[in-house]
């Protein structure tokens, strides 16, 4: 059974001025990428199975009221970045599904995507990382799926969430260190702090009274 993300050690609270500065810092200053590391046979098998699971997508929400509330709230916040309402809802449903499937908080994943790609589907970093979650191309070969397209919405989110889950497991739930691994900057504070700032200031979610009924 996966551990709940709420049990993971989080970063200490940051002063408001620091949060604002991190939110609007140039993304290029924090450019990084996952680093290639040989995998044990068991880890390779687990990652390959996770990425390869293409079962039909079902609802990842507790019920329809929660789904309606969450999608409406997040859609409003994301409208300027993804103007097309159909594409925006498909993106949000996919983020919620893939994050929940990997045992991650969807709000954390939204914060990470904001920092990694600014919600640009076809973003490519100077290191070659691709798509919404800036996945390095070596992963598709590493897990034995060299034909996977990292610019495909569900594929990119599946890889990104699976990789972050893998790093969380390596770091025994230490989110700070897992984010450092994800960005290729393990031990440095800038990237984890920036994701935390985006998560706290842009993507925190509290259910409305309607959704709680």
Question: How does the language model describe each region?
Answer:
Residues 13-26:
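Bacterial N-terminal signal peptides
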Residues 33-50:
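Short N-terminal segments immediately surrounding and downstream of signal-peptide cleavage
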Residues 1-9:
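N-terminal secretory signal peptides that target proteins for export/translocation
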Residues 8-11, 210:
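Short, aromatic- and cysteine-enriched interfacial helices/patches
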Residues 16-18, 41, 49, 80:
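Residue-level marker of intrinsically disordered, low-complexity segments enriched
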Residues 27-31:
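Sec/Tat signal peptide C-region and signal peptidase I cleavage site
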Residues 53-213:
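Catalytic glycan-binding domains that act on GlcNAc-containing polysaccharides
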């Amino acid at each position: 059974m996966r551990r709940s993300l709420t049990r993971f050690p989080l970063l200490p609270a940051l002063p408001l001025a620091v949060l604002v500065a991190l939110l609007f810092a140039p993304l290029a200053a924090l450019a990084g990428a996952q680093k290639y590391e040989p995998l044990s046979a068991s880890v390779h098998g687990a990652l390959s199975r996770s990425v390869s699971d293409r079962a039909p997508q079902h609802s990842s929400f507790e019920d329809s009221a929660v789904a309606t509330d969450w999608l409406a709230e997040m859609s409003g916040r994301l409208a300027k970045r993804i103007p097309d309402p159909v594409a925006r809802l498909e993106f949000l449903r996919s983020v919620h599904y893939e994050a929940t499937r990997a045992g991650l908080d969807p709000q954390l994943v939204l914060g990470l995507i904001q920092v990694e790609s600014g919600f640009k589907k076809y973003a490519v970093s100077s290191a070659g990382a691709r798509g919404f979650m800036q996945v390095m191309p070596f992963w598709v070969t590493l897990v034995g799926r060299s034909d996977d397209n990292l610019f495909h919405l569900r594929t990119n989110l599946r890889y990104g969430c699976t990789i972050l889950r893998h790093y969380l497991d390596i770091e025994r739930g230490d989110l700070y260190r897992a984010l450092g691994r994800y960005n290729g900057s393990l031990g440095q504070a800038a990237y984890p702090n920036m994701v935390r700032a985006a998560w706290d200031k842009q993507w925190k979610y509290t259910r409305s009274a309607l959704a709680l009924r």
